[in-house]
Amino acid sequence: MANLHPTAWVAPGAYLRGDVTLGEQTNVWYNAVLRADQEKITIGAFSNVQDNCVLHGCTVEDKCLIGMNSVILDHAVIGEGSIVGAGAVVAAGTIVPPRSLVVGIPAKVKKTLTDEDVAGSVANADSYLGLMTIGQADPENQG
């Protein structure tokens, strides 16, 4: 039973199962899998879950970017404004502080994001919002 904000977008081929909540202007890209069949998944506003990610019962706060091919396991929390680097695996129960860059297997905090980093991430998110709008308007992208 997905609970999607009216401005959220899920790409064709992405799969949401169970108790998933997507916030305002959040987008989930191609072939991502959000498995909330055992634990709830909450993705905050203005967040971006990129292609081929796998999320289990976790919380992703507002304005986060979850890089391509990342995995986030049960009970992990990704703090507001954080970036999970492409291919990272966030272990079960990991608490990522706000404004963190996490990378690796298992994912570790690489650095705290500066205001400049956050501004760049917000600009990147804005570009994805544009792509999301194109995807919504293009009948070829509707599954």
What function would you assign to each model-found segment?
Residues K40:
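Phosphate/pyrophosphate-binding betaalpha-module
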Residues P6, A11-P12, R17-G18, G23-E24, ...:
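Left-handed beta-helix
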Residues N3, V54, V60, V71, ...:
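C-terminal segments of enzyme domains that contribute to small-molecule binding surfaces
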